Amino acid sequence: KDLGLFNEAIESYEWAISYGPKYAIAHINLASIYSSYDLEKALHHYQEAISIEPNFPEAHYSLGTVLSSLGQKDESMKSYEKALELRSDYVEAHNALSTIKKYKKNDPQIKQMKNLLKQTNLMLSDKISLNFALAKVSEDLENHKDFFKFLNEGNHLNKEKLNYSIDSDLEGISNIRNIFINSKGGAPKSNLKKGMPRPIFIVGMPRSGTSLVEQIISSHTEVYGAGELDFLSRSILKEIHTEVYGAGELDFLSKNVLKEIKPDNIKKIDSKEFFEKITNNYYRSLSSFNISEDIFTDKMPLNFRFIGFILSAFPEAKIVHLKRDPIATCWSIYKHYFKSNGNGYASNFDDLSSYYLMYKGLMDFWHKTFPNQIYDISYEDLTLSQEKETRKLLNYCDLSWDDRCLNFHKNTRAVHTTSGFQVREKMYQGSSEAWRKYEQYLEPLISKIGDAK
Protein backbone atom coordinates (compact mmCIF):
# COMPACT_ATOMS: atom_id res chain seq x y z
CA LYS A 1 0.00 0.00 0.00
CA ASP A 2 2.77 2.47 0.93
CA LEU A 3 4.34 1.88 -2.49
CA GLY A 4 1.11 2.73 -4.28
CA LEU A 5 0.55 -0.93 -5.26
CA PHE A 6 -3.12 -0.79 -4.37
CA ASN A 7 -4.28 -3.81 -6.37
CA GLU A 8 -1.68 -6.01 -4.68
CA ALA A 9 -2.62 -4.63 -1.24
CA ILE A 10 -6.31 -5.27 -1.90
CA GLU A 11 -5.57 -8.87 -2.86
CA SER A 12 -3.60 -9.38 0.36
CA TYR A 13 -6.36 -8.00 2.60
CA GLU A 14 -9.08 -9.93 0.75
CA TRP A 15 -7.04 -13.09 1.19
CA ALA A 16 -6.82 -12.39 4.93
CA ILE A 17 -10.59 -11.82 5.14
CA SER A 18 -11.33 -15.01 3.20
CA TYR A 19 -9.48 -16.96 5.89
CA GLY A 20 -10.77 -14.87 8.77
CA PRO A 21 -14.00 -13.01 7.89
CA LYS A 22 -14.29 -11.78 11.48
CA TYR A 23 -10.87 -10.09 11.31
CA ALA A 24 -11.89 -6.46 11.91
CA ILE A 25 -8.45 -4.96 11.25
CA ALA A 26 -8.31 -6.49 7.76
CA HIS A 27 -11.68 -4.91 6.95
CA ILE A 28 -10.40 -1.54 8.19
CA ASN A 29 -7.18 -1.79 6.16
CA LEU A 30 -9.11 -2.76 3.05
CA ALA A 31 -11.58 0.07 3.61
CA SER A 32 -8.74 2.57 3.95
CA ILE A 33 -7.63 1.74 0.39
CA TYR A 34 -11.13 1.83 -1.05
CA SER A 35 -11.79 5.17 0.66
CA SER A 36 -9.61 6.81 -2.00
CA TYR A 37 -11.77 5.79 -4.93
CA ASP A 38 -14.65 3.43 -4.09
CA LEU A 39 -16.54 4.78 -1.10
CA GLU A 40 -19.35 2.24 -1.28
CA LYS A 41 -16.85 -0.55 -0.70
CA ALA A 42 -15.11 1.52 1.98
CA LEU A 43 -18.42 2.03 3.78
CA HIS A 44 -19.18 -1.68 3.54
CA HIS A 45 -15.89 -2.74 5.10
CA TYR A 46 -15.96 -0.13 7.87
CA GLN A 47 -19.51 -1.22 8.70
CA GLU A 48 -18.36 -4.85 8.66
CA ALA A 49 -15.59 -3.98 11.11
CA ILE A 50 -18.10 -2.24 13.39
CA SER A 51 -20.51 -5.19 13.22
CA ILE A 52 -17.63 -7.45 14.30
CA GLU A 53 -16.36 -5.08 17.00
CA PRO A 54 -19.04 -2.45 17.76
CA ASN A 55 -16.90 -0.89 20.49
CA PHE A 56 -13.96 -0.24 18.17
CA PRO A 57 -13.51 3.58 18.27
CA GLU A 58 -11.04 3.62 15.37
CA ALA A 59 -13.64 2.01 13.10
CA HIS A 60 -16.25 4.64 13.99
CA TYR A 61 -13.70 7.40 13.43
CA SER A 62 -12.71 6.00 10.03
CA LEU A 63 -16.34 5.60 9.05
CA GLY A 64 -16.78 9.27 9.92
CA THR A 65 -14.01 10.27 7.51
CA VAL A 66 -15.70 8.40 4.64
CA LEU A 67 -19.08 9.91 5.43
CA SER A 68 -17.39 13.31 5.51
CA SER A 69 -15.91 12.69 2.06
CA LEU A 70 -19.42 11.87 0.84
CA GLY A 71 -20.73 15.15 2.21
CA GLN A 72 -22.89 13.44 4.84
CA LYS A 73 -22.12 15.95 7.57
CA ASP A 74 -24.65 14.89 10.21
CA GLU A 75 -23.83 11.19 9.88
CA SER A 76 -20.12 11.96 9.95
CA MET A 77 -20.53 13.94 13.18
CA LYS A 78 -22.45 11.03 14.74
CA SER A 79 -19.60 8.65 13.91
CA TYR A 80 -16.98 10.96 15.41
CA GLU A 81 -19.16 11.45 18.50
CA LYS A 82 -19.55 7.68 18.85
CA ALA A 83 -15.77 7.27 18.67
CA LEU A 84 -15.44 9.87 21.45
CA GLU A 85 -18.17 8.20 23.49
CA LEU A 86 -16.10 5.01 23.38
CA ARG A 87 -12.80 6.81 23.97
CA SER A 88 -13.02 10.35 25.30
CA ASP A 89 -9.27 10.94 24.87
CA TYR A 90 -9.36 10.08 21.15
CA VAL A 91 -7.60 13.23 19.95
CA GLU A 92 -7.92 12.54 16.21
CA ALA A 93 -11.68 12.26 16.60
CA HIS A 94 -11.78 15.53 18.56
CA ASN A 95 -9.84 17.24 15.78
CA ALA A 96 -11.93 15.76 12.97
CA LEU A 97 -15.16 16.73 14.72
CA SER A 98 -13.89 20.29 15.20
CA THR A 99 -13.48 20.77 11.45
CA ILE A 100 -17.18 20.23 10.73
CA LYS A 101 -18.87 21.37 13.93
CA LYS A 102 -20.04 24.90 14.77
CA TYR A 103 -19.28 25.51 18.45
CA LYS A 104 -21.27 27.38 21.07
CA LYS A 105 -19.82 28.70 24.32
CA ASN A 106 -20.77 25.93 26.76
CA ASP A 107 -20.15 22.92 24.53
CA PRO A 108 -18.79 20.14 26.85
CA GLN A 109 -16.32 19.01 24.18
CA ILE A 110 -14.40 22.27 24.63
CA LYS A 111 -13.63 21.47 28.27
CA GLN A 112 -12.68 17.90 27.34
CA MET A 113 -10.13 19.15 24.80
CA LYS A 114 -8.68 21.76 27.16
CA ASN A 115 -8.27 19.14 29.90
CA LEU A 116 -6.54 16.81 27.46
CA LEU A 117 -4.16 19.57 26.42
CA LYS A 118 -3.09 20.02 30.07
CA GLN A 119 -1.82 16.43 30.29
CA THR A 120 1.95 16.28 30.68
CA ASN A 121 2.42 12.95 28.87
CA LEU A 122 0.62 13.99 25.69
CA MET A 123 2.26 13.01 22.40
CA LEU A 124 3.46 15.88 20.23
CA SER A 125 1.04 14.99 17.43
CA ASP A 126 -1.87 15.09 19.89
CA LYS A 127 -0.80 18.51 21.19
CA ILE A 128 -0.82 19.78 17.61
CA SER A 129 -4.26 18.33 16.85
CA LEU A 130 -5.76 19.78 20.03
CA ASN A 131 -4.30 23.24 19.41
CA PHE A 132 -5.77 23.33 15.90
CA ALA A 133 -9.11 22.05 17.21
CA LEU A 134 -9.22 24.69 19.95
CA ALA A 135 -8.24 27.33 17.40
CA LYS A 136 -11.33 26.36 15.41
CA VAL A 137 -13.43 26.61 18.59
CA SER A 138 -12.03 30.10 19.25
CA GLU A 139 -12.73 31.13 15.66
CA ASP A 140 -16.35 29.99 16.00
CA LEU A 141 -16.67 31.93 19.27
CA GLU A 142 -14.98 34.98 17.65
CA ASN A 143 -12.28 35.08 20.30
CA HIS A 144 -9.46 36.42 18.09
CA LYS A 145 -6.81 36.43 20.81
CA ASP A 146 -7.29 32.75 21.71
CA PHE A 147 -7.73 31.88 18.03
CA PHE A 148 -4.20 33.06 17.25
CA LYS A 149 -2.78 31.71 20.51
CA PHE A 150 -3.87 28.15 19.69
CA LEU A 151 -3.21 28.53 15.97
CA ASN A 152 0.34 29.81 16.43
CA GLU A 153 1.13 27.11 18.99
CA GLY A 154 -0.27 24.37 16.76
CA ASN A 155 1.81 25.55 13.82
CA HIS A 156 4.93 26.00 15.96
CA LEU A 157 4.65 22.43 17.26
CA ASN A 158 3.91 21.10 13.79
CA LYS A 159 7.11 22.63 12.42
CA GLU A 160 8.98 20.98 15.31
CA LYS A 161 7.38 17.59 14.61
CA LEU A 162 8.07 17.71 10.87
CA ASN A 163 11.62 19.02 11.40
CA TYR A 164 10.94 21.10 8.31
CA SER A 165 13.52 23.28 6.57
CA ILE A 166 12.46 25.72 3.85
CA ASP A 167 16.00 25.48 2.44
CA SER A 168 15.36 21.84 1.61
CA ASP A 169 12.31 22.75 -0.48
CA LEU A 170 14.05 25.67 -2.18
CA GLU A 171 17.00 23.46 -3.09
CA GLY A 172 14.65 20.75 -4.31
CA ILE A 173 12.82 23.17 -6.60
CA SER A 174 16.14 24.39 -8.01
CA ASN A 175 17.04 20.78 -8.78
CA ILE A 176 13.65 20.21 -10.43
CA ARG A 177 14.45 23.00 -12.87
CA ASN A 178 17.90 21.60 -13.57
CA ILE A 179 16.65 18.04 -14.04
CA PHE A 180 13.97 19.24 -16.43
CA ILE A 181 16.32 21.50 -18.41
CA ASN A 182 18.78 18.61 -18.77
CA SER A 183 16.13 16.08 -19.84
CA LYS A 184 14.14 18.40 -22.12
CA GLY A 185 13.90 17.38 -25.75
CA GLY A 186 13.87 13.62 -25.42
CA ALA A 187 10.18 13.30 -24.63
CA PRO A 188 8.02 11.09 -26.86
CA LYS A 189 5.23 12.67 -28.88
CA SER A 190 2.62 10.57 -27.12
CA ASN A 191 2.52 7.91 -24.44
CA LEU A 192 -1.28 7.64 -24.36
CA LYS A 193 -2.28 4.15 -25.43
CA LYS A 194 -5.71 3.20 -26.72
CA GLY A 195 -8.25 3.01 -23.91
CA MET A 196 -6.25 5.22 -21.55
CA PRO A 197 -8.18 8.24 -20.20
CA ARG A 198 -6.72 11.69 -20.85
CA PRO A 199 -5.57 13.63 -17.76
CA ILE A 200 -6.42 17.14 -16.65
CA PHE A 201 -3.95 18.21 -13.96
CA ILE A 202 -5.30 20.91 -11.64
CA VAL A 203 -2.45 22.65 -9.84
CA GLY A 204 -1.65 25.67 -7.70
CA MET A 205 -1.02 26.47 -4.08
CA PRO A 206 -3.19 24.57 -1.58
CA ARG A 207 -6.34 26.48 -0.60
CA SER A 208 -6.35 28.34 -3.93
CA GLY A 209 -9.55 26.79 -5.30
CA THR A 210 -8.29 23.53 -6.81
CA SER A 211 -11.06 21.48 -5.13
CA LEU A 212 -13.72 23.84 -6.47
CA VAL A 213 -12.40 23.64 -10.03
CA GLU A 214 -12.16 19.85 -9.89
CA GLN A 215 -15.74 19.70 -8.62
CA ILE A 216 -16.83 21.84 -11.59
CA ILE A 217 -14.95 19.86 -14.24
CA SER A 218 -15.81 16.45 -12.77
CA SER A 219 -19.52 17.34 -12.89
CA HIS A 220 -19.22 16.91 -16.67
CA THR A 221 -20.52 13.56 -17.93
CA GLU A 222 -17.25 12.81 -19.75
CA VAL A 223 -14.98 13.38 -16.74
CA TYR A 224 -13.99 11.28 -13.73
CA GLY A 225 -12.78 13.23 -10.69
CA ALA A 226 -9.89 11.25 -9.20
CA GLY A 227 -9.04 13.77 -6.48
CA GLU A 228 -5.63 14.37 -4.94
CA LEU A 229 -3.33 11.66 -6.25
CA ASP A 230 0.29 11.21 -5.25
CA PHE A 231 0.94 8.98 -8.27
CA LEU A 232 2.77 11.65 -10.29
CA SER A 233 5.26 12.68 -7.61
CA ARG A 234 5.83 9.01 -6.73
CA SER A 235 6.47 8.15 -10.38
CA ILE A 236 8.83 11.08 -10.94
CA LEU A 237 10.79 10.68 -7.70
CA LYS A 238 11.08 6.93 -8.18
CA GLU A 239 12.52 7.34 -11.67
CA ILE A 240 14.89 10.14 -10.67
CA HIS A 241 16.15 8.00 -7.80
CA THR A 242 16.48 4.91 -10.00
CA GLU A 243 18.28 6.79 -12.79
CA VAL A 244 20.78 8.31 -10.37
CA TYR A 245 21.26 5.59 -7.74
CA GLY A 246 19.88 2.46 -9.37
CA ALA A 247 18.25 1.52 -6.04
CA GLY A 248 15.08 -0.45 -5.41
CA GLU A 249 11.60 0.93 -4.91
CA LEU A 250 11.72 1.14 -1.13
CA ASP A 251 14.75 3.43 -0.94
CA PHE A 252 13.25 6.48 -2.60
CA LEU A 253 10.41 6.66 -0.07
CA SER A 254 12.78 7.32 2.81
CA LYS A 255 14.94 9.96 1.13
CA ASN A 256 14.58 13.59 0.13
CA VAL A 257 15.36 12.67 -3.46
CA LEU A 258 15.10 16.16 -4.92
CA LYS A 259 17.43 17.72 -2.36
CA GLU A 260 20.06 14.99 -2.64
CA ILE A 261 20.45 15.19 -6.41
CA LYS A 262 23.80 16.68 -7.48
CA PRO A 263 24.51 18.39 -10.84
CA ASP A 264 26.67 15.51 -12.07
CA ASN A 265 23.91 13.02 -11.23
CA ILE A 266 21.40 14.92 -13.34
CA LYS A 267 23.41 14.20 -16.49
CA LYS A 268 22.75 10.47 -16.01
CA ILE A 269 19.05 10.81 -16.83
CA ASP A 270 18.04 9.40 -20.22
CA SER A 271 15.19 11.61 -21.41
CA LYS A 272 12.99 9.41 -23.60
CA GLU A 273 13.05 6.32 -21.41
CA PHE A 274 12.77 8.49 -18.28
CA PHE A 275 9.48 10.06 -19.38
CA GLU A 276 8.07 6.77 -20.67
CA LYS A 277 8.66 5.15 -17.28
CA ILE A 278 6.94 8.04 -15.50
CA THR A 279 3.89 7.60 -17.72
CA ASN A 280 3.79 3.83 -17.29
CA ASN A 281 4.20 4.02 -13.50
CA TYR A 282 1.46 6.63 -13.25
CA TYR A 283 -1.10 4.69 -15.29
CA ARG A 284 -0.24 1.46 -13.48
CA SER A 285 -1.23 3.11 -10.20
CA LEU A 286 -4.28 4.72 -11.80
CA SER A 287 -5.57 1.35 -13.06
CA SER A 288 -7.03 0.56 -9.62
CA PHE A 289 -9.67 3.26 -10.23
CA ASN A 290 -11.23 1.39 -13.20
CA ILE A 291 -12.07 4.68 -14.93
CA SER A 292 -14.65 4.32 -17.71
CA GLU A 293 -14.75 8.01 -18.68
CA ASP A 294 -12.48 9.37 -21.45
CA ILE A 295 -11.04 12.09 -19.23
CA PHE A 296 -10.05 12.31 -15.56
CA THR A 297 -8.84 15.01 -13.20
CA ASP A 298 -5.83 14.83 -10.90
CA LYS A 299 -5.93 17.76 -8.51
CA MET A 300 -2.81 17.38 -6.40
CA PRO A 301 -2.00 21.10 -5.97
CA LEU A 302 1.76 20.67 -5.52
CA ASN A 303 2.06 19.06 -8.94
CA PHE A 304 2.81 22.63 -10.04
CA ARG A 305 6.40 21.61 -9.26
CA PHE A 306 6.34 19.09 -12.09
CA ILE A 307 4.48 20.88 -14.92
CA GLY A 308 7.40 20.45 -17.32
CA PHE A 309 7.53 16.74 -16.58
CA ILE A 310 3.75 16.45 -17.05
CA LEU A 311 3.80 18.07 -20.48
CA SER A 312 6.75 15.89 -21.49
CA ALA A 313 5.40 12.59 -20.17
CA PHE A 314 1.73 13.32 -20.95
CA PRO A 315 1.66 15.49 -24.12
CA GLU A 316 -2.15 15.21 -24.28
CA ALA A 317 -2.60 16.51 -20.75
CA LYS A 318 -4.30 19.77 -19.91
CA ILE A 319 -2.87 21.92 -17.12
CA VAL A 320 -5.27 24.12 -15.15
CA HIS A 321 -3.50 26.50 -12.78
CA LEU A 322 -5.44 28.21 -9.98
CA LYS A 323 -4.49 31.75 -9.01
CA ARG A 324 -5.87 33.39 -5.90
CA ASP A 325 -5.06 36.49 -3.85
CA PRO A 326 -1.71 35.66 -2.18
CA ILE A 327 -2.70 36.80 1.33
CA ALA A 328 -6.02 34.93 1.15
CA THR A 329 -4.22 31.80 -0.05
CA CYS A 330 -1.47 31.85 2.56
CA TRP A 331 -3.80 32.75 5.41
CA SER A 332 -6.08 29.85 4.52
CA ILE A 333 -3.06 27.53 4.44
CA TYR A 334 -1.81 28.74 7.83
CA LYS A 335 -5.13 28.14 9.58
CA HIS A 336 -5.42 24.54 8.38
CA TYR A 337 -3.56 21.60 9.88
CA PHE A 338 -1.30 20.02 7.26
CA LYS A 339 0.21 16.83 8.64
CA SER A 340 2.67 15.92 5.88
CA ASN A 341 6.17 17.26 5.39
CA GLY A 342 5.19 18.12 1.82
CA ASN A 343 3.29 21.07 3.29
CA GLY A 344 5.78 21.78 6.08
CA TYR A 345 6.18 25.36 4.87
CA ALA A 346 2.65 26.06 6.18
CA SER A 347 3.75 26.31 9.80
CA ASN A 348 5.12 29.84 9.99
CA PHE A 349 4.80 33.08 8.06
CA ASP A 350 8.48 33.27 7.03
CA ASP A 351 8.48 29.79 5.47
CA LEU A 352 5.04 30.31 3.98
CA SER A 353 5.97 33.57 2.26
CA SER A 354 9.28 32.13 0.99
CA TYR A 355 7.48 29.09 -0.41
CA TYR A 356 4.83 31.25 -2.05
CA LEU A 357 7.45 33.41 -3.77
CA MET A 358 9.29 30.25 -4.89
CA TYR A 359 6.02 28.88 -6.30
CA LYS A 360 5.40 32.13 -8.17
CA GLY A 361 8.93 32.07 -9.62
CA LEU A 362 8.59 28.46 -10.74
CA MET A 363 5.23 29.14 -12.38
CA ASP A 364 6.81 32.05 -14.28
CA PHE A 365 9.49 29.61 -15.49
CA TRP A 366 6.92 27.04 -16.65
CA HIS A 367 4.88 29.72 -18.44
CA LYS A 368 7.96 30.93 -20.32
CA THR A 369 9.00 27.38 -21.19
CA PHE A 370 5.50 26.27 -22.25
CA PRO A 371 3.73 29.36 -23.62
CA ASN A 372 -0.03 28.91 -24.09
CA GLN A 373 0.03 25.37 -22.64
CA ILE A 374 -0.96 26.27 -19.08
CA TYR A 375 -4.43 27.65 -18.40
CA ASP A 376 -4.56 30.20 -15.59
CA ILE A 377 -7.89 30.71 -13.86
CA SER A 378 -8.49 33.29 -11.15
CA TYR A 379 -10.44 32.05 -8.14
CA GLU A 380 -11.87 35.54 -7.64
CA ASP A 381 -12.95 35.83 -11.30
CA LEU A 382 -14.59 32.42 -11.09
CA THR A 383 -16.66 33.38 -8.05
CA LEU A 384 -17.68 36.71 -9.62
CA SER A 385 -18.46 35.41 -13.14
CA GLN A 386 -19.26 31.73 -12.68
CA GLU A 387 -20.82 30.89 -16.05
CA LYS A 388 -18.40 32.97 -18.13
CA GLU A 389 -15.32 31.47 -16.46
CA THR A 390 -16.78 27.95 -16.51
CA ARG A 391 -17.37 28.17 -20.26
CA LYS A 392 -13.79 29.31 -20.83
CA LEU A 393 -12.49 26.53 -18.59
CA LEU A 394 -14.44 23.78 -20.36
CA ASN A 395 -13.40 25.14 -23.75
CA TYR A 396 -9.73 24.90 -22.77
CA CYS A 397 -10.28 21.31 -21.59
CA ASP A 398 -11.87 20.42 -24.98
CA LEU A 399 -15.18 19.70 -23.27
CA SER A 400 -18.62 20.60 -24.57
CA TRP A 401 -20.95 22.68 -22.44
CA ASP A 402 -22.72 20.78 -19.65
CA ASP A 403 -25.20 22.54 -17.34
CA ARG A 404 -24.16 20.19 -14.54
CA CYS A 405 -20.89 22.09 -14.31
CA LEU A 406 -22.83 25.14 -13.08
CA ASN A 407 -24.60 22.95 -10.51
CA PHE A 408 -21.35 21.43 -9.28
CA HIS A 409 -22.63 21.49 -5.68
CA LYS A 410 -24.99 18.63 -6.59
CA ASN A 411 -22.08 16.39 -7.59
CA THR A 412 -22.03 13.39 -5.22
CA ARG A 413 -18.44 12.30 -5.89
CA ALA A 414 -16.08 11.84 -2.98
CA VAL A 415 -14.06 14.87 -1.88
CA HIS A 416 -11.20 14.09 0.49
CA THR A 417 -9.82 17.60 1.08
CA THR A 418 -10.52 20.23 3.72
CA SER A 419 -12.77 21.93 1.16
CA GLY A 420 -15.07 18.90 1.02
CA PHE A 421 -18.19 20.57 2.42
CA GLN A 422 -17.55 23.93 0.74
CA VAL A 423 -17.65 22.45 -2.77
CA ARG A 424 -21.08 20.97 -1.99
CA GLU A 425 -22.48 24.47 -1.58
CA LYS A 426 -23.36 26.99 -4.28
CA MET A 427 -20.67 29.41 -5.41
CA TYR A 428 -20.15 32.20 -2.91
CA GLN A 429 -18.12 35.40 -3.07
CA GLY A 430 -15.95 37.25 -0.61
CA SER A 431 -13.87 34.44 0.91
CA SER A 432 -10.69 36.07 -0.41
CA GLU A 433 -11.41 39.08 1.82
CA ALA A 434 -11.99 37.08 5.03
CA TRP A 435 -8.40 37.61 6.20
CA ARG A 436 -8.90 41.37 6.56
CA LYS A 437 -10.52 41.10 10.00
CA TYR A 438 -7.27 39.53 11.24
CA GLU A 439 -5.03 42.04 9.46
CA GLN A 440 -3.22 43.15 12.63
CA TYR A 441 -2.05 39.57 13.22
CA LEU A 442 -0.94 39.01 9.62
CA GLU A 443 1.49 41.91 9.15
CA PRO A 444 4.58 39.64 8.79
CA LEU A 445 2.85 37.87 5.91
CA ILE A 446 1.42 40.99 4.29
CA SER A 447 4.79 42.78 4.28
CA LYS A 448 6.43 39.93 2.33
CA ILE A 449 3.84 38.82 -0.22
CA GLY A 450 1.19 41.53 -0.25
CA ASP A 451 2.35 42.68 -3.68
CA ALA A 452 3.03 39.21 -5.14
CA LYS A 453 0.10 39.16 -7.55
Please annotate each region the language model reported.
Residues K1-D2, I25-S35, E58-T65, E92-T99:
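Conserved alpha-helical positions within TPR/SEL1-like repeat arrays
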Residues D2-W15, I25, S35-E48, S69-K82, ...:
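Structural signature of tandem alpha-helical TPR/SEL1-like repeats
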Residues N95, I202-G204, Q215, I295-P301, ...:
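Short beta-strand segments
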Residues S98, I110-N121, S125, N131-P199, ...:
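PAPS-dependent sulfotransferases, especially Golgi type II membrane carbohydrate sulfotransferases
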Residues S190-E239, Y245-S312, L322:
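Phosphate-binding active sites in nucleotide-utilizing proteins
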Residues I310-I333:
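Conserved phosphate-donor/acceptor-positioning beta-strand/loop module used by diverse small-molecule
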